[in-house]
Structures are given as structure tokens and as C-alpha cells.
Amino acid sequence: VTHFFVQDKNSAELLKSIGFKNTTINGDSRFDSVLANTQNPVKIPLIEVFCKCKPTVICGSTWKKDELLLIRFIKENPQYNYIIAPHEMHHISYLQKQTGAQLFSTSNTENINSNNVLIIDSIGILANIYQYGKLAYIGGGFGVGIHNILEAVAFGLPIIFGPNHQKFNEAKELINQKGAISISNYKELNSAINVFSDFDKSIAINYI
């Protein structure tokens, strides 16, 4: 190998520390992809109607441990609307029982605001739902690791996630820039959402 193309400065510095100086920072194609999506996002009229009534917390790719915290917050904080896109579809019935949520697939503009919780039971639309949110909770941080946070960040949303995020440079960088908060319990979740209730979207947008 005569030359290394790397995604970021940290990778270049790591190679330099072990004697490899022939590096070029080539960027991360994930950033290009999410940025392109914000330029021409797919509109979802039903979601737009739902999110107009109250500030909306988008809960993307949630797992059971995420959902246990979120369900409590939802029950105690009716001042928000909530959209939940669970990672595992078999969690949907449990979430419905706990929150009284309606399903995206069976909702229409007449009944969409009959409940402040909407569950996404359709695949492939989450990335475009973020355009309507106030803030995002990204799941996976209480398990093997957080899911994609860049899709939400690109639309200017502040991000909340669980403690297992150390392998993701973007998560650590956004925490340092006050665009993300890592939480490990309900008290921290409650505090984080309150902190982000008045968020400057330029912090997230400028990161991308």
C-alpha cells in the first residue's frame, strides 16, 4: 500500500501516529447522501398534518430498552407529539398497548390527531420523516450501538441516544458541539428533551 484514503482527520492522525504520512482525507459518503436528501426530501402529507399540532419527538429505530424510557416520558409529557419507528416490527403491538398509539398505515387526515403517538409500520420512510420533527431520539444505544443519526442531523434536529455510541465519531463530535446528548436513564432523558426544547437548528445543519 502506497497511499491511504481516509474518511476524517482522526483516521489520518491515527495513521500518522504509527508512521504513515501518505494519507488523504476523502470524506464520508454518508454525509453526501443525507445532505442530498435534504435538498429534495419526499413529502409525507399525513406526517406533516400530525406534526403541525404540537412539537414532535421523532423516535427512530428504537429497541425495547429505549422504548421503556420513552413510554414513561410519553405518558408524563402530553405537550409533545411522538412518532415511533421501532427497529423490530413485532414491538408494535406492545407500543400500542402502552401508549394507545395509532398506526401510520391505517391513519388518514381526519383521524391522524386523535392520539399524540403515531407508530410507523411502513419501511423506508423514516429518513424523510425527520424533516417534520422538533428533535430526535435514535435507538440502539442501550444495545450493540446507535443507529444512523445523520439522517436526523441533516434536517437540523438535536439528537438524543443511549450510552453505547463510542464507535461513532459523529456522535462524539455532536456531543462536543452541543448538538447531541447521551443518556443512560430516565432522569437524563427527561433533562435532555427539556434542554433541546429551544434548540438552534444551525448547530446540527452546520455539522453536515
Where are the model-predicted features located?
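Nucleotide-activated sugar donor-binding and catalytic core shared by glycosyltransferases
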Residues: 1-208
